[in-house]
From Swiss-Prot:
InterPro entries: Poneritoxin
Gene Ontology MF terms in the entry: toxin activity
GO cellular-component term (any): extracellular region
Keyword Hydrolase included in the entry's annotation: no
Protein name, UniProt field: U1-poneritoxin-Na3b
Entry superkingdom: Eukaryota
Annotated signal peptide: none
Protein family (similarity comment): Belongs to the ponericin-G family.
């Protein structure tokens, strides 16, 4: 349910977060 979505979002952010931050800083 809802908690599963939060867990998935958290896992995705852990994977993608650093790359997104790097991309944002480089702009």
């Amino acid at each position: 349910g809802f908690m599963d979505l939060i867990k998935k979002a958290g896992g995705w952010l852990k994977k993608k977060g650093p790359a997104l931050i790097k991309a944002a800083l480089q702009e």
